[in-house]
Amino acid sequence: MTNKKTFALLLFWLFFIFAFSYLIPDFSNNYRYMMVEGEDRLIASFYDIVVSQYRHYFTWGGRTPPHVLASSLLYLGKGVTAFATAACYILLVYLIFKISCIEKQVFTKHLNKILFITTMLWICTRNYGEVFFMTVTACNYFFTTTFILFLCTYFAKSFGGNVNTDKQNFSKALIPLFFILGVIAGWCNENTGFAICFASFLAIVYFYFNKKLNAVHMSLFLGFCVGFLILVLSPGNHVRLENMEKGSFDYFEHIFTAIEIFFISLFENSLLLIAMAYLLYLSVKHKILRKYKEQYLQALYLFMVGFASLAIMIFSPNFPARSSTPFTFFSIATVLCLYNIVNKEEIKVMSSVKQKVLYGLALSYFVVTASNAYGALFTIRDDCKQRDVQIQKMISEGQKDLVVEPFRVQTSRYIFIADVRQDPKYFANQILTRYYHLNSIRRSCDYKKSNYPATDFHLIQDYGKKVCESSK
């Protein structure tokens, strides 16, 4: 019976993620990665993608692996992208479950854990709509962090002795493959690249002194480091930084803003942090820390990867909310790992009544926010269709400087809208100017800045009315 319920839950999320990913319109950066870098033409082959990302590495950024994936998915179309997103979501849930296990467990027999993972992903992931459904962002954070979880599983399991760390565990012929996979992982993203290098270095020191270190650990770690260096030393990253410094960017002032974003991210993951603290309290109370020393180190490793990926962003010149995604994913895994330790000792974590109440509240939250997001989704689809008709009509009339009407939906946690603004120099405007071969494009008006400390505090959309009214 549990298996059937588990399959039903996974099937629901597979369909939910597929539908949302398929129906959401493309915005800003998606259009950019549909085009060949340095040209105003659409990508027409995989060769174009290689050329485009080669140029991109030298002119704007170093995240080649996720950007190759993003351009490939955009080239292959919505159907393939939606299927890949949904499949990766199920893989993410599986990997979080697997990396948190302290002994062998059958995935489909643990409905409550799968329910916990999917619930926490929905509640705690900042800018959920952007992270999972905006193709370029999804490739930068969702797909890459899932891949990194896969590679970190070997490190995490090595603490508890759940993998054979003997040097002959893997064929020597596979060692170069682990190195290559490590390079790709380190090359994916600045914050996760740093985090896996930092946490895995500490793990390797521990394995060395406890005679657990093997060639797989070293090949992965060296791959992480090489990939991270390829990323941070890319000429494109230096160009990007120079462009920021040419403006009014003040690094000292930015640090205070970054610290604020850091604490907002901690606050939005506070349910997970509270759960960690409570499970550690139970561990101390029942005096099981020594007994499960290595399993607690496994949990610590998971937390260190997530926390390091978030903390390093304080020193980055750009700290978007989406960059907290790895922290959320690894924090969920940390909580489950701690729970598995406590549960192995048959320590009661929570009464069944309290558990049902919490899941009831979570279900209510999901129903309200998800149904509202779907309503907003169909509204923005209709708006984009009307916008496209409006643009094509003006282009057919020979216009090169376009003014478009505003949408009836704003960006929120579960719906991501990266619309053009009134300023034609805004980055989204410039992307569409290239895409449509125009002189300029702008929106007729801008809406007032939200009172929320961040857009993802906006949980419920008041959609249906234009986000702003033209002053003319």
What are these regions (language model features)?
Residues 19-83, 135, 185-300, 314-323:
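Transmembrane catalytic cores of multi-pass membrane glycosyltransferases
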Residues 110-159, 189, 267-272, 307-338:
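Membrane-interface micro-motifs in multi-pass membrane enzymes
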Residues 157-183, 218:
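Short hydrophobic alpha-helices at membrane interfaces in multi-pass membrane enzymes
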